[in-house]
Amino acid sequence: MVKIVLASGSPRRSELLKQIGLDFEIVLSDIDESNEENLKANELVQHLAYKKAYDVAKKVANRENGKERYLVVGADTVVVKDRIMGKPKDRDDAVRMLKHLSGSWHEVMTGIALIDTKDFRSVTSVEITKVKMKELTDDTILAYVDTKEPMDKAGAYGIQEKGAILVERIEGCYFNVVGLPLGRLSDLLKDFGVSVLKKI
């Protein structure tokens, strides 16, 4: 029996896995998330997702003398409009990001990586969703940033929380904007013999 491991401390990703009924444990990775290789956004999120998953796969692979089989899920999300935006560094950075996104379309990219500790077979993929932000007044931006909600989110907003009122429309997977594209993840899990709709 394979055991699912989520290589992420994101509460949103945990909630999404619970939503589709997966049993899993959380093991955090210790990787550097900087873009030292100057990769394009779609490459970067897959690269970081893989690094997270690989780091955690190495940690859990030797449990029980390697008798247990683990399927490690790594993910990384960025927002892209002219540049790559991760989580804001501070309050001012969050304000700058929201002003940059105001009144325009941007892309949310989530890279996913799965690694099977049995043979370290891996697969990576990326999901892209387009999001149109409303025209935001300075007062709205400052009030939203003051909620502290943006500080741990790529692009400085959370579509599943108060940030929902900032969004005009989206094209593509909503769950991708939250942090984990569930349809794409389900397809990847099938490649490793795991069905969301059937008990493992």
From Swiss-Prot:
Pfam families, A to Z: Maf
EC number: 3.6.1.9
Gene3D superfamilies cross-referenced by the UniProt entry: 3.90.950.10
Gene Ontology cellular component list: cytoplasm
Residues forming the catalytic site: D76 (proton acceptor)
Segments traversing the membrane: none
Keywords: Cytoplasm, Hydrolase, Nucleotide metabolism
Any one GO molecular-function label of the UniProt entry: UTP diphosphatase activity
Site (Important for substrate specificity): R12, T77, Q160
Record's keyword annotation contains ATP-binding: no
SUPFAM superfamilies, A to Z: ITPase-like
Single biological process term from Gene Ontology: nucleotide metabolic process
Keyword Ubl conjugation on entry: no
Cell location: Cytoplasm
Major enzyme class: hydrolase
Listed cofactors: a divalent metal cation
Enzymatic reactions: dTTP + H2O = dTMP + diphosphate + H(+); UTP + H2O = UMP + diphosphate + H(+)
Family annotation (InterPro entries): ITPase-like_fam, Maf-like
Family: Belongs to the Maf family. YhdE subfamily.
Job description of the protein: Nucleoside triphosphate pyrophosphatase that hydrolyzes dTTP and UTP. May have a dual role in cell division arrest and in preventing the incorporation of modified nucleotides into cellular nucleic acids.
Protein name: dTTP/UTP pyrophosphatase
Organism encoding this protein: Acetivibrio thermocellus (strain ATCC 27405 / DSM 1237 / JCM 9322 / NBRC 103400 / NCIMB 10682 / NRRL B-4536 / VPI 7372)
